[in-house]
């Protein structure tokens, strides 16, 4: 029996299920940086101006994890790294001065800010923060699967004597890149099949359990990072959520994993009429 849970770069998956094209892979990279001097270290998610993907700041016990995720076929390291630094500097600047903008003027346009960019007091604050961070950050990078809808129909990740789990199987949310839940759930489903002596049932079990959700997310991905009423869909989505409590609640549940993609249209329609 062969079970592979060795990530998106799994050589076992390439051999047994076939290699995925770059268009079905995402790149995530970032920095582990010190906690802000103030006690305020919020979680922040920011959609990238002019790019597919998003940036994040996730505080941990002893550091803040900053990162960017985008599709591998659109990946350009230099401008994305500059955009991430712009986001990081804005994050720390806001901890020291709540009036400071998250993005520099260039970063807000999705362009390289060339470090701290701009001029005046904001320029000086970002420059001093950058000097401190350059000496203390630790870099990391990873690949994340983001399968196309049709790939879910054709790609097998299990057989009579083998199985792929988690990222090795391509089990990650194509919209957000989240994969921890699917890694744990696929392991649980496989364990049930193995203990029952029915390993070949694993393929059917994962498809019935969460396969439709992942495929639905994959179909929604292009729309999610597209445009709506003359602006990026993500910007319109935030505007609607700010104004409407029902939409705000639904999006919060979607991000938290409490609302599935399959039923999200119906939920939004109901809550648009009855917000509570």
Q: In which residue ranges do the predicted regions lie?
A:
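Predominantly flavin-linked oxidoreductase catalytic cores and closely associated redox partners
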Residues: 1-105, 113-115, 121-132
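Fold-independent oxyanion-binding glycine-rich loops
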Residues: 5-7, 48-50, 60, 69, ...
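Short, function-defining helix-loop hinge/capping sites that tune catalysis or transport
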Residues: 14-15, 175, 181, 216
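Residues in and immediately flanking transmembrane alpha helices
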Residues: 19, 180, 186, 234-235
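A general structural signal for well-ordered alpha-helical segments in protein cores
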Residues: 26, 81, 162, 217-220, ...
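Short flexible/disordered coil segments
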Residues: 37-42, 46, 129-132, 136, ...
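FAD/FMN-dependent oxidoreductases across multiple families
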Residues: 74-193, 199-201
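C-terminal helical "tail/cap" subdomain of flavin- and related membrane-associated enzymes
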Residues: 192-276
């Amino acid at each position: 029996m062969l079970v592979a849970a060795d990530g998106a770069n799994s050589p076992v998956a390439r051999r047994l299920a076939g290699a995925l094209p770059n268009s079905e892979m995402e790149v995530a990279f970032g920095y582990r940086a010190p906690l802000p001097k103030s006690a305020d270290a919020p979680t922040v998610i920011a959609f990238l101006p002019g790019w597919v993907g998003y940036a994040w700041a996730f505080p941990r016990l002893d550091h803040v994890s900053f990162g960017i995720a985008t599709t591998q076929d659109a990946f350009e390291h230099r401008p994305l790294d500059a955009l991430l630094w712009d986001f990081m500097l804005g994050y720390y600047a806001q901890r020291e001065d709540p009036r400071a903008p998250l993005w520099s003027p260039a970063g807000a346009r999705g362009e390289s800010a060339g470090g701290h960019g701009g001029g005046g007091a904001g320029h000086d604050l970002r420059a001093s923060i950058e000097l401190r961070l350059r000496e203390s950050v630790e870099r990391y990078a990873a690949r994340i699967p983001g399968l196309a809808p049709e790939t879910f129909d054709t790609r097998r990740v299990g057989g009579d004597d083998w199985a792929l789990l988690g990222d090795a199987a391509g089990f990650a949310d194509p919209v957000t890149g989240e994969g921890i839940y699917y890694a744990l759930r696929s392991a649980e489903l496989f364990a049930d099949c193995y203990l029952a002596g029915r390993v070949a049932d694993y393929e059917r079990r994962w498809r019935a359990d969460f396969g439709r959700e992942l495929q639905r997310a994959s179909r929604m991905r292009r729309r999610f990072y597209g445009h709506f009423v003359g602006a990026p869909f993500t910007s319109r989505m935030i505007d609607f959520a700010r104004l409407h409590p029902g939409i705000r609640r639904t999006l919060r549940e979607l991000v938290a994993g409490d609302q599935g993609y399959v039923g999200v249209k119906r939920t939004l329609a109901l809550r648009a009429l009855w917000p509570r």
